[in-house]
Every structure is written in structure tokens, then in C-alpha cells.
UniProtKB/Swiss-Prot annotation:
Disulfide bridges in this chain: none
Low complexity composition bias: residue spans: 190-215, 297-307, 460-474, 481-498, 531-590, 617-656
Residue spans of biased composition, Basic and acidic residues class: 115-127, 165-181, 499-515
Taxonomy, superkingdom: Eukaryota
Lineage: Eukaryota, Sar, Alveolata, Apicomplexa, Aconoidasida
Region annotation (Disordered) ranges: 78-220, 251-280, 296-332, 459-657
Name of this chain's protein: Uncharacterized protein MAL13P1.336
Source organism of this protein record: Plasmodium falciparum (isolate 3D7)
Keywords, sorted A to Z: Coiled coil, Merozoite
Record's description of how this protein is used: Possible candidate for an effective malaria vaccine as determined by epitope response in sera.
Polar residues bias: start-end ranges: 263-276, 308-331, 520-530, 591-602
Keyword set includes Mitochondrion: no
Coiled coil: 86-139
């Protein structure tokens, strides 16, 4: 053995003596260990080291392995376990860094490599023995035919208690690598090809044959077991495992009745004539009829129109809650006030948060037969004003009789009068001021020689009439709802806008540049939720009232005279001063396209300025804009942003309609007008 030599002369002799003693002891242990086969077997099971792990270990750096077997038989001279990590006591520490060739520490692992190779050879010999035993076992299987009549192929009889069979049985019990010899004892396999009705009989015959031959069951089984075709291979017992295995199959006494079929309510659909389904939106029609379930079919006795009952039978409970409301707009030509009368009963604070069933997009949902009878339209309004469902039927019948005699007198109804009063957008307390504003040369009036004109360009006024919020409860794009006096012939001013708004695709107007395009001015929002209460198709909302009651027309027209917006607390410009709004900053933005813009000193200077609060959080268009809950006018914000204060006379005041498609175009034009005010041209279209 090569070991580190110590320079010190005193220690050199001692090291040499220790090496000689170790070599002698190793030779003795080699001779003894070669004769012990038990150690070889134990090493085969316990030592799993190879050369690639042992090479590289030196005297000073060993592998910490607890070796069992030969190393434990070395006696007292062998070092203790883990000694490979311990350094030999040397006084000269300077030469510890110098190491010779790395070899196995024979002191800790004597003759380890030789013993491992011997173990490998012995294991290979054992495998050869097992292979021979496997061949012998196969011969036994061929000679022993267990379940036949007891004769093998050569005509010799075999006894189940013979040594050959017992050896095979013992071998299969302890050898896990050998295949299970139950394969030839699977009675279920032999009976699978037979009819299922004969399985038990065939199994009993096989068992009787085995018992008569005194062979018995080779593997310890119960002789009275019943084997069926559903027991898994290799299992014993009477429990079936196949698809016919159920925990318990019983009957309930008495037999339970069959489940009831789902209830289908086709009452509403039966009221839809087939000739009118073609041109209408079927989806919204079906949802509207399902929401308007009939309360009493006798309501239709006094009407030739069968679908009137489903329109009038809106549950009042839904009106008085924050839940879904059925806002009914019947005929395209009969612009009645059902939405307003429904929402009169809405509680404050709940209306804006609720998802309202919007039936406004369908021109003729409930009034399916297109009955151009104002009385049938007003029946819905009167029904919405009923707080007691018990009085609903009588009141409907009375109203049908009364309204047939008074077809043109819509404003005599209390509900219609109250709704026309609600159309005064902010429950205005000072109607004289509003009328004075209407008479002051079409919303232009002079104060301190400054010309003020309300336009669609107001940015500094909070709570404007139209909201850009998605969950807004105002009518979506209140288009030309209040035409005003003498404007009955201008019914088609917004047809182009309505056609564009009827399209279902989302044009992504808001997603381009919110601050420049949408919030730059207050325009309609085509991407607003479809669940909002909108008045999209009410092109001629109050023209029915214009025929008879001019006073109510004045009230409705005043909504638009106030700059075409819902100023709420700013119903007249005098109130603007009272609300801490400076005239120049508030109204200076209204001079962008007006004649006489130069007459308002410093007006256009504040055109695109925001106050400090609005610079931080653009609340002007996002907080409570047109939220009718604050003013008890839940649905009264129906201003006209396209038909401005001139009632369709666009040549007046150079004030043109503004659509959301025209925002960029008009914005560039307005910027040019700031630098170069346009000349007065009354003939400009």
C-alpha cells in the first residue's frame, strides 16, 4: 500500500510498521472470506457501489459509505465506520496538500472491488439456476393436465400430492417473476364461449369431475363456490364484478309517479300573428312577450286587438322595485309615454343600477297588428299608473270605451298631463324664465352687451343631459324627442342617424381617443349598453300633443331651448352665476361656430380649458350626467343633440347638427374657425 511518507524520522518507522500489519491482516481476511458464501449473498443485497464511485477517493478524501459484509468481519484492526473522513494524525501539516495518485482507501474498504466482482459472478450463476428451474417447470405443466380426466398426454396418471407437483407449487409461491399458474385454472375462461344460461351448470360439472377424481382444487379454494362469467381473473368468491353488479335492485312500493314534464307557457306566442313576424326583430319580440305574461285573458274582450292584453298586463310589482321593468313602446307612429309612466314609480337610487329590459328598439312589439289607434296606446300608460292590480281590468275596460270616443284628446288623460309635466326636464320651478328664454330670439339674449348662445360645445358644465357611462339610465340617444312648436312636419330630420344607430355592429367610436373625440363635446354614444332605457326610434315623440295642447308643447319645447342640454340647476343663465360659474368661462365655449363670436370678448379663450377638478378626474362626462334620479325625472332626459335649438332650421346661426361620425371633421372646422371666424352666410346648409 502506498501511503504518505512522513519526513520526521521518529514517526517514519511507526508508519511502516502499521502498513505491514494491515497487509498481513488483509491476507488473512481474504482467505477467510472466500470460504464464506453467506457474506457473498449479504453483500449482493447490501452493497451497491461501483468502480466509478470508488475511483477518485483517496486517503484524505473518502466516500462516506457504511459497508456491511466483509468489512464488518475484519475485527478490531479494521477502522470504524466513517473513518474515511478522518485524517491521520500527522505533525507535519505542510505536506498535507500534496497528494499522490488517487486510489481506494484499503484501510476503510479492504478488497471491496474484488468482492463486488465476485458477487456479480455469483448472481449470474443464480440466474442460470433459475432459468433451469423455469424449464423444468414448463415440463411439469406439459405432463400434468389438471382439469381433464387425470390422464396426461402419455396416458400416465399424476397424483396431486407427488413431489414433482409439490415442487412446482412451492416454486410458484415464492417466485414473483414466474407467471401466475392460475392461468390454466380459470374456469370462467372456459365458459365464456358458452351460453350465459349454461355457465353455472358447466361450472358445477367441472367441479364434480374434479372432486370425483380425488384431485380436489389444487389451489386452496372453497369447493362450494359459484363461478360466473363476471368474476375477474385470479379472484375467488361469489361476488360479481362485471356490469351486472349492483348494490341493490329493488322497487319502491307504491310506485312513484312519473316526473312532470317542464311547463311551457305559449300564451304570449299565440298572440303573435304570423303575418307580422317577418319584418320585426324576433328576438326582442319574444323576450317582450315572455316578460308581459297575461294576467287575465278577459281583458281582450273589449278589443279587436288580441295582443293588447299582453302589452297592458305589465306587473306593477316590477314597476315599484329596482328589478327589471317592462318599458313598452307600441306603435312606431303612436309615440306614447309608457316609458315615463313606468319610471315614475321607480325608487330613487335604484333605477340607475338596475338592468332594464329594453323593448324600445322594436317599433311594434306589443301592438303587433299595427292598430293606429291612439286609445290602445294610451291604455298602456293608464295601466302603468295603476298601483292596484285588482283595479286593472276594470280601468282598462273603462278606458277602452272612453278613449274610443276621444281619440284625439290624449292630453286630457291625467297620466298624459303628468307625463308632459315630467318632460319639463328638471322640474323647473320658474317657467316664466324658461318662456322668456324661448322668446329671446331663439336662445340668444344680451347681458352686459355680451351675446350668449347655447350650443353642443359646453365642457365646463357638470351633469349634462347625455351621459357617456355604460350603465346610464337615461334614454340612449334621445333623438328629436321634443320637436316643439310648429315642427310637426320635420319628422324625418334624424332618419340617417337612426339608420346608422340601428346597426348592430360596434363601430368602436369610443376606443379611438376618448378625450379628443367623445369627451371633446357631448355627442351621442353608440356603444352604450343595450339594456339602457333608450328612446331610439321615438322620432316624433310629442307630436301627438302638438295637435291639441300647445301649452304642453311649450313645456316640452323648453327642454330643448335650454341649449339643447339638461343643465338641471342651470335652467337659465342667470342661475349659472348663482352656481359659481363665471360667464366667460362657462359660456365662452359657446362661441365657436356662432355669428358675432368676436363680440364676446375673451369668449373663445376658454374654449378648451377645464377647471382644476376636471383636469384631475374627467368627471364632467362621467359623474351623474343626466342621471334623472337626482331630480325626480327618471326618464325625462330626452334632449335632441342632432336637431339643435333651431328646430331643423340649420341655416340659422350657422349651428349645424353634430353626429358622432362627424366629430373629427367638425373639430377641424372649429379649430379653423377660431383662427378665422366664418362670414355670415344665412344660406349655408
Amino acid at each position: 500500500m502506498e501511503d504518505k511518507e512522513v519526513v520526521n524520522s521518529e514517526n517514519k518507522v511507526e508508519v511502516i510498521k502499521e502498513e505491514e500489519n494491515i497487509k498481513k491482516e488483509d491476507d488473512v481476511t481474504k482467505k477467510v472470506s472466500e470460504n464464506t458464501e453467506d457474506n457473498d449473498i449479504s453483500l449482493a443485497n447490501n452493497v451497491s457501489l461501483g468502480k466509478h464511485l470508488l475511483i477518485g477517493s483517496s486517503l484524505k478524501k473518502g466516500i462516506s459509505v457504511s459497508v456491511r459484509g466483509r468489512t464488518m468481519n475484519l475485527g478490531m484492526n479494521a477502522k470504524q465506520a466513517g473513518s474515511a473522513w478522518k485524517k491521520k494524525e500527522t505533525e507535519n501539516v505542510e505536506e498535507e496538500g500534496e497528494e499522490k495518485e488517487k486510489k481506494i482507501d484499503d484501510e476503510s474498504f479492504p478488497d471491496l472491488l474484488e468482492s463486488t466482482e465476485k458477487m456479480k459472478s455469483e448472481l449470474s450463476k443464480e440466474k442460470d439456476k433459475k432459468k433451469k428451474q423455469l424449464k423444468d417447470g414448463k415440463k411439469v405443466e406439459d405432463n400434468v393436465n389438471v382439469f381433464n380426466s387425470g390422464f396426461d398426454r402419455g396416458g400416465k396418471t399424476t397424483d396431486g400430492n407427488s413431489t414433482e407437483f409439490n415442487d412446482k407449487k412451492k416454486y410458484n409461491m415464492y417466485d414473483g417473476n414466474k407467471k401466475n399458474d392460475n392461468a390454466f385454472n380459470k374456469k370462467w375462461y372456459n365458459n365464456q364461449q358458452n351460453d350465459m344460461n349454461n355457465n353455472n351448470q358447466n361450472n358445477q360439472n367441472n367441479m364434480n369431475n374434479n372432486n370425483n377424481n380425488n384431485n380436489g382444487h389444487i389451489f386452496d379454494t372453497n369447493e362450494s363456490e359459484e363461478v360466473t362469467g363476471y368474476i375477474l381473473p385470479g379472484f375467488k368468491g361469489k361476488h360479481m364484478v362485471g356490469f351486472t353488479c349492483f348494490l341493490k335492485r329493488g322497487t319502491q312500493n307504491p310506485v312513484p309517479p312519473p316526473p312532470a314534464p317542464p311547463l311551457t307557457n305559449n300564451q304570449g306566442e299565440n298572440n303573435i300573428p304570423t303575418d307580422n313576424r317577418n319584418n320585426e326583430n324576433k328576438k326582442l319580440m319574444n323576450t317582450n312577450i315572455k316578460m308581459n305574461q297575461q294576467v287575465d285573458n278577459n281583458n281582450n274582450n273589449n278589443n279587436n286587438n288580441n295582443n293588447l292584453g299582453s302589452a297592458m298586463n305589465t306587473p306593477m310589482n316590477n314597476m315599484n322595485k329596482g328589478g327589471p321593468r317592462n318599458n313598452v313602446n307600441n306603435s312606431e307612429h303612436m309615440r306614447e309615454h309608457s316609458n315615463h309612466t313606468v319610471n315614475r314609480f321607480a325608487p330613487m337610487g335604484q333605477y340607475a343600477n338596475s338592468k332594464n329590459n329594453n323593448m324600445n328598439n322594436v317599433h311594434n312589439v306589443n301592438n303587433v297588428n299595427n292598430v293606429n289607434n291612439v286609445n290602445n296606446v294610451n291604455n298602456v300608460n293608464n295601466m302603468n299608473n295603476m298601483n292596484n292590480m285588482n283595479n286593472m281590468n276594470n280601468n282598462m275596460n273603462n278606458m277602452n270605451n272612453n278613449m274610443n270616443n276621444n281619440m284625439n284628446n290624449m292630453n286630457n288623460m291625467n297620466s298624459m298631463n303628468s307625463m308632459n309635466n315630467m318632460n319639463n326636464m328638471n322640474s323647473m320651478n320658474n317657467m316664466n324664465n324658461m318662456n322668456n328664454m324661448n322668446n329671446n330670439n331663439n336662445n340668444k339674449f344680451n347681458e352686459n352687451n355680451i351675446l350668449y348662445k347655447g350650443t353642443n360645445y359646453n365642457r365646463n358644465v357638470k351633469n349634462l343631459g347625455q351621459n357617456n357611462n355604460e350603465g346610464n339610465t337615461n334614454m340612449k340617444h334621445g333623438h328629436n324627442n321634443n320637436r316643439g312648436q310648429g315642427n310637426n312636419n320635420n319628422n324625418n330630420n334624424n332618419n340617417n342617424f337612426n339608420r346608422r344607430n340601428d346597426k348592430n355592429d360596434n363601430r368602436n367610436f369610443r376606443r379611438k381617443d376618448i378625450d379628443l373625440e367623445i369627451n371633446w363635446r357631448n355627442t351621442a354614444n353608440p356603444t352604450q349598453e343595450e339594456n339602457n332605457n333608450n328612446m331610439n326610434h321615438n322620432n316624433n315623440y310629442n307630436n301627438n300633443n302638438n295637435n291639441n295642447n300647445n301649452n304642453n308643447n311649450n313645456n316640452n319645447n323648453n327642454n330643448n331651448t335650454n341649449h339643447g342640454k339638461n343643465f338641471r340647476n342651470f335652467n337659465n343663465l342667470n342661475n349659472m352665476k348663482n352656481n359659481n360659474s363665471s360667464n366667460n368661462k362657462m359660456m365662452g365655449m359657446n362661441h365657436m361656430q356662432q355669428k358675432g363670436m368676436n363680440s364676446s370678448t375673451g369668449g373663445h379663450k376658454y374654449s378648451f380649458n377645464k377647471n382644476d377638478d376636471q383636469k384631475n378626474n374627467n368627471k364632467m362626462y362621467k359623474n351623474n350626467m343626466g342621471n334623472a334620479n337626482n331630480n325626480n325625472n327618471n326618464n325625462a332626459v330626452n334632449t335632441n343633440f342632432n336637431n339643435n335649438n333651431n328646430n331643423g332650421n340649420f341655416h340659422m346661426n350657422n349651428n349645424k347638427s353634430i353626429n358622432s361620425m362627424d366629430v373629427k371633421k367638425t373639430r377641424m372646422k372649429d379649430i379653423r374657425n377660431l383662427n378665422d371666424p366664418p362670414k355670415v352666410n344665412n344660406n349655408e346648409a
